[in-house]
């Protein structure tokens, strides 16, 4: 395995983050968003269900701090060296008397940030209130600064390398919708159609494999069409039913979404009027 992009691309991203940190007068930044860790270093593992962060400094490569059993994925998917991999012990997981963020805080202390301004992501999944509280109480000697979405803004404008990966994701998304079109029919169960969709999304296209998309396949059929994000069921599609499918493709963690509406037979005039209006733009 190797990182999804070459080192120069990751260096470009790190330079952007450090520039934004300087603009906000930050000496360091603690990242809790798995997507931001992935964008910055390539780190890719299903490890975000336990406490983990990435520390960004001005004079040191990014530092990953997480569960010991997940440290191997850092070497497999990033350019980081052993000096930048700081795991905590397995016996700290799911304990009431101690929290992994305390060990992470002790490790961060080694970078001599006392009295320094340290940013953190305040509104992100998988970086819980307790995790933030334990980290900040452990490192009470630093000045904490809300730096939410700092990395996200750096991600906004895509590089040429990123656009190429997104094009592959879009091709996968287009193929996924084509597969859905070929298999959707009255009598087919929603779950069986989704099985075809997931197979197509994972197999990818033209030799490029697919990843798990950020959004699972959404099937809006029958009563479920009255809401925005219903999960699929084992209910068969019906004749003359209007069905909306919100699908997508993913490649190297880059996503492309594509929504389509199908009419399984005859539909009310309002459906055709809406389709004509959409076609006209």
Q: What are the residue ranges of the model-derived segments?
A:
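Active-site neighborhoods and metal-handling regions in enzymes and metal-associated proteins
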Residues: 1-281
């Amino acid at each position: 395995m190797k990182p999804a992009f070459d080192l120069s691309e990751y260096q470009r991203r790190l330079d952007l983050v450090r520039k934004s940190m300087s603009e906000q007068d930050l000496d360091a930044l603690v990242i809790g968003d798995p997507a931001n860790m992935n964008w910055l270093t390539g780190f890719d593992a299903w490890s975000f269900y336990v406490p983990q962060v990435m520390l960004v400094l001005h004079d040191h490569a990014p530092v990953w701090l997480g569960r010991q059993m997940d440290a191997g994925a850092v070497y497999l998917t990033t350019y980081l060296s052993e000096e930048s991999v700081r795991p905590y012990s397995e016996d700290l997981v799911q304990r009431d008397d101690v929290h992994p963020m305390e060990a992470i805080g002790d490790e961060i202390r080694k970078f001599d940030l006392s009295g320094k301004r340290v940013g953190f992501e305040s509104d992100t999944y998988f970086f819980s209130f307790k995790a933030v509280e334990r980290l900040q109480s452990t490192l009470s000697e630093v000045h904490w600064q809300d730096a939410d979405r700092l990395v996200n803004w750096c991600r906004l404008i895509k590089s040429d390398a990123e656009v190429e990966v997104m094009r592959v994701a879009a091709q996968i998304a287009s193929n996924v919708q084509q597969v859905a079109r070929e298999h959707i029919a009255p009598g087919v169960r929603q779950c069986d159609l989704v099985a075809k969709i997931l197979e197509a999304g994972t197999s990818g296209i033209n030799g490029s494999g697919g990843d798990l998309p950020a959004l699972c396949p959404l099937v809006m059929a029958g009563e479920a069409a009255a809401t925005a994000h219903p999960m699929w069921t084992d209910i068969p599609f019906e004749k003359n039913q209007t069905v909306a499918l919100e699908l997508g493709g993913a490649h190297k963690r880059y996503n492309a979404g594509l929504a389509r509406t199908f009419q399984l037979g005859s539909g009310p005039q309002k459906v055709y009027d809406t389709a004509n209006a959409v076609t006209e733009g």
